[in-house]
Amino acid sequence: MNILPVYKASFFLSQQREDGLKLRVIYAGDHVYTDFQIGEQFQSETDSLYNGILFGIMDVLMWYAILMQTKKICMTKKIDIEFLEPISCNVPYRAKSKLLNADEKDIHVTAWIEDNNGQVYSKVTALFREGRGMNASDIINNFDFSETTPEMKEFFDSFLE
């Protein structure tokens, strides 16, 4: 299990933010994932989790899926998302993401949220593009590596060379 480093200020990932989700992203070779169970503080008027929170989780995972496969810092350009079933509070789910394909300019990726039985509750496909003027070292220098392995730290240090 390879826990990925997190951006220290991330609402979704930081383990230090009291108001955040404190997700841990795991690198599994051909995909990334996170297990989560979110409480009522993010419950909508329909007694399910806000779709914006769900998209945010999938967007973060897509960013990591791209980073791990291409070593590129990318930004979301276009999304196609489906919310198939409501996601309940205080129930365990797993969100996954994997790279579909990448060429010189366009990077296509997908993510989805499923329950313990593999039923998919929401899914997204997206087009990402490499961020212009973005410096990988500026981002990576703001990562928290406290839960990563030395090998994962070494992988991310290779971005700085």
PLM regions and their residue ranges:
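Non-catalytic linker/capping segments at the edges of enzyme domains
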Residues: 1-40, 140-161
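HotDog/MaoC-like acyl-thioester-processing domains
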Residues: 1-4, 87-89, 100-161
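Short beta-strand micro-motifs enriched in acidic
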Residues: 26-28, 98-102
